[in-house]
């Protein structure tokens, strides 16, 4: 990620190529740092969610290694940007592959299971609140990725 004048970045391409696998121009000066912080924000939240989820799996009696192996090939492990966002909300397609109402139902059941095993569910509770808030403004039948649209319109 590089911020600044595109011509300046191109003039340094050999340097960037030597230290990075991929160079993406992200905007004017300062955009590189902002992008780095936003990227690390998501990475650390994903790390915390992964830890909470694998702890949940362990508490309900699942094998952590088997669960992690399975999840690494599903939307849970591959991430929304690699699976759903590009074909759904970022393509302006909010037709439901997995509607918000179903996300709430599954979160309700998972949170109930977590509660019965005294498992941490901080991120589950936060996610449910976000989906419920979106449902309350009439977005329940839209694809679960529509929470991005909800957040963009809510600010």
Q: Where on the chain are the PLM-derived regions?
A:
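Short, basic/aromatic-enriched C-terminal tail that caps enzymatic domains
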Residues: 141-155
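Interdomain hinge/lid region at the active-site interface
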Residues: 33, 83-144
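Internal alpha-helical scaffold of NAD(P)-dependent oxidoreductase catalytic cores
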Residues: 1-35, 41-80, 117
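A generic structural signal for secondary-structure junctions
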Residues: 17-20, 72-76, 86, 90, ...
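Electropositive, surface-exposed helix/loop patches at the edges of structured domains
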Residues: 24-27, 101-105, 155
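Generic detector of well-ordered alpha-helical packing
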Residues: 40-41, 53, 107, 144
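Short acidic/histidine-centered micro-motifs embedded in hydrophobic/aromatic stretches
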Residues: 56, 70-74, 126-133, 150
